[in-house]
Curated annotation (Swiss-Prot):
Binds 1 FMN per subunit. Keywords: Flavoprotein, FMN, NAD, Oxidoreductase. The keyword Oxidoreductase applies. Quinone reductase that provides resistance to thiol-specific stress caused by electrophilic quinones. One of its GO terms (molecular function) is electron transfer activity. Belongs to the azoreductase type 1 family. The gene is azoR. It comes from Shouchella clausii (strain KSM-K16). Homodimer. This is FMN-dependent NADH:quinone oxidoreductase. Pfam families: Flavodoxin_2.
Amino acid sequence: MATVLMINASDRLEQGVSVKMYNQFLNSYKEAHPNDTVEELNLFAEKLPYYGNTAITGQYKKAQGVELTGEEKEIVETIERYQEQFLNADKVVFAFPLWNFTVPAPLITYLSYLAQAGKTFRYTETGPVGLVGSKEVALLNARGGVYSNEEMAALEMAANLVRTTMAFWGITQPVEVIIEGHNAAPDQADAIISEGLENVKKAAVAF
């Protein structure tokens, strides 16, 4: 039995294509792997505190054995709770849209919680080394425009951001399913989304 962490990074629960991808993957995975444990995490619903001075100072003080303020202690414990959940999962699925060239803010915050030396990577004399390379990861991304061509590729900072972050942590071959172009070609949107969701289903069964 595997533990699978399903992460939804969109609050467009009725209209969002990445949410449709999330739901398709979730249902198909459960059907194909009935004995696995699935944990769901909706990042917008979690209302994650921003990763800023309080969090950074609190983590530094804890590492140095210095007493934390109440506010620092609260956010450090929050960060550690999400770290533990991620690290304990055998498989992790990220479902997220591209909004204004990048990912929604809660996903940035969540990745910041996880991107901690000694947790997901460590420093060595020859450079940083990922610590979670054995974890299986799937990336489900929806983007209304077409960013797979050379002209637009440099503007794609959603899938590329998450993919690069995973690689830094040692996860170099995530499963990826991308649905793109449904807003750019509305007359083809249904077909584009339908084909993409079929690819999501296949990925879930094989994951």
